[in-house]
Amino acid sequence: MKINILTLFPRYFEVFCRESIIGKAIKQKKITINVVNFRDFSKNKHKKVDDYVYGGGPGLLLQIQPVVDALEKVGGLKIALSPQGQKFDQSVARKLAKEDEITILCGHYEGFDQRIIDNFIDFELSLGDFILTGGEIAAMAIIDAIIRLKPDIINPESLKNETFNDFLLDFPQYSRPANFRGLEVPKVLISGNHREIGEWRQEQRELITKKKRPDLWEKFLKIKNKK
């Protein structure tokens, strides 16, 4: 899979592309990440890529020319990060993980010239209902969520029980020591009875989801009732 990242701040991604799962996937040539600087496509001698908004108002806007020129040099599904976009979730991550190539545009300032969105983008994505200075942090989160779903990146058994796979949150997990300052690990987990451990974990997933995320609980019940 190839992921193109269009940004004003390519250095944001230097450590991101070297460390953890992303770095490992790149070294193993499972994925390619191509970071593109909008400024490289500016026709301004000072590499300026922003300007004032027509009609007045505070802030600056990314200009259409350098953004479109950058877009035309890359392929795949074109995705702009925007507060107006579809909310990113695990189901979107799964769909994007099936693509051979995607391009992510990181906004900045007051966003993009609307003509970019209307004519050169396939769709918009939002990480949630909050404001970030730019799209770089959101891009990293989205890329991480996508890459870990690709084959041979993470143990498939580890993915099966992860939160959101079946609309249930994960079960509580514990490690050594079994007793820390009187705080004990549930006895069932050290019983060696794998059937009881499995039942306990499923029960905990349902209890936690029902309590903490009633919206996910409703989705889980709908799927469960259809079976």
From Swiss-Prot:
CDD domains, per the entry: TrmD-like
Catalytic activity: guanosine(37) in tRNA + S-adenosyl-L-methionine = N(1)-methylguanosine(37) in tRNA + S-adenosyl-L-homocysteine + H(+)
Compartments where found: Cytoplasm
Record has Transferase as a keyword: yes
Gene Ontology CC terms: cytosol
Enzyme's top EC category: transferase
Location (main, coarse): cytoplasm
Entry keyword set: Cytoplasm, Methyltransferase, S-adenosyl-L-methionine, Transferase, tRNA processing
Keyword tRNA-binding: no
EC number: 2.1.1.228
InterPro entries in the cross-refs: Alpha/beta_knot_MTases, tRNA_m1G_MeTrfase_C_sf, tRNA_m1G_MeTrfase_TrmD, tRNA_m1G_MTases_N, tRNA_MeTrfase_TRMD/TRM10
HAMAP family on file: TrmD
Free-text function comment from the UniProt entry: Specifically methylates guanosine-37 in various tRNAs.
Similarity annotation: Belongs to the RNA methyltransferase TrmD family.
Description of how the protein assembles with itself and partners: Homodimer.
Name recorded for this polypeptide: tRNA (guanine-N(1)-)-methyltransferase
Organism of this sequence: Mesomycoplasma hyopneumoniae (strain 7448) (Mycoplasma hyopneumoniae)
